[in-house]
């Protein structure tokens, strides 16, 4: 289930702004059309990191005018689905997959050299996403192992990792898993709060921990599930209370009603969007400096909300898998065929 989103391949459509007052995506040439980027970390308006298929990691420090291939050596067979940057030089990247395909790499010199800091040795584990609370503390999550989601923890910025006990993790539902679609199935806000998105089971749930992954509570969402291709694919929290969930059915020939939901109580309850995005969405991010504004992206377009997820409207029809905004307001998107873009006003 975790890799199911990789099967969604739709042709890219030209990006175009829908209204003069709205921001728009400005495409940035990454120098490749063969890589699908599902990992993205926005540092600021000038600096961003991308990760994807073929073991690829790219970095720009000039607003996307130029991209440097800083891929770890010997990783061409890996899929880097999540990347978390601390700045222009320090970054941690997650490779997903069964068994030893799930790995974590870290660089402290902008990708000139890399250290493999974790390699999964449990054939039953499949890591999907990771998140950092600060420069030291972070978590990664795996699909259920022996009936419970597995959590990996670091306290030194991703240099070493430890599997946490699963005693505080609720039992997974039959068929439940995470979607490694955009690096946003595990997200955090503040020093200790973290949320995990699921799909594939009878109900699409969001699990919440307020103690950095030691104990968790589960809540149902209105996003449809009941199929390995359906559920919550991405989360975004602007603080520990207010969050957004997006997803649906990744299959291009299937509808995705109720593709978005929101919470105002740290994920204890979720309300469906009154006017959701018109199709499956794989990535979501809040816009800094605009309290109630957020973007959702997917293979068929980008949607904008200005009322904290109650209503969404189409902003762009280009194909993107993931989206991220930096604290300075710099927003980036990336996806199939080497696509990358920066949001412009």
PLM feature segments, named:
Residues 1-17:
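Secretory targeting and sorting signals
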């Amino acid at each position: 289930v975790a890799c199911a989103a990789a099967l969604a391949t739709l042709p890219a459509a030209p990006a175009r702004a829908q209204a003069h007052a709205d921001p728009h995506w400005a495409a940035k040439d990454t120098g490749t059309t063969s890589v699908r980027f599902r990992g993205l970390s926005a540092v600021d308006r000038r600096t961003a990191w991308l990760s994807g298929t073929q073991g690829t990691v790219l970095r720009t420090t000039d607003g996307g005018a130029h991209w440097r291939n800083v891929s770890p050596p010997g990783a061409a067979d890996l899929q880097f689905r999540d990347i978390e940057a601390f700045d222009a030089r320090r970054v941690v990247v997650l490779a997903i997959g069964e068994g030893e395909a799930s790995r974590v790499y870290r660089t402290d010199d902008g990708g000139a050299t890399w250290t493999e800091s974790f390699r999964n040795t449990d054939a039953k584990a499949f890591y999907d996403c990771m998140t950092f609370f600060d420069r030291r503390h972070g978590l990664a999550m795996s699909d259920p192992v022996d009936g419970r989601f597995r959590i990996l923890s670091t306290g030194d910025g991703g240099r070493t990792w430890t599997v946490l006990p699963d005693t505080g993790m609720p039992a997974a539902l039959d068929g439940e898993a995470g979607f490694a679609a955009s690096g946003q199935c595990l997200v955090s806000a503040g020093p200790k709060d973290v949320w995990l998105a699921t799909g594939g089971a009878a109900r699409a749930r969001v699990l919440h921990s307020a103690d950095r992954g030691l104990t968790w509570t589960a809540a149902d969402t209105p996003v449809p599930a009941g199929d390995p291709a359906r559920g919550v694919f991405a989360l975004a929290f602007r603080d520990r209370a207010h969050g957004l969930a997006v997803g649906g059915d990744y299959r291009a020939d299937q509808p995705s009603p109720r593709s978005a939901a929101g919470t105002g109580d740290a994920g204890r309850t979720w309300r469906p969007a009154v006017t959701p995005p018109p199709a499956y969405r794989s990535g979501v991010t809040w816009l800094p400096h605009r309290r109630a504004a957020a973007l959702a992206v997917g293979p068929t377009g980008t949607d904008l909300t200005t009322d904290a997820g109650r209503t969404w409207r189409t902003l762009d029809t280009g194909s993107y898998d993931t989206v991220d905004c930096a604290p300075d307001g710099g927003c980036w998107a990336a996806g199939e065929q080497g696509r990358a873009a920066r949001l412009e006003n």
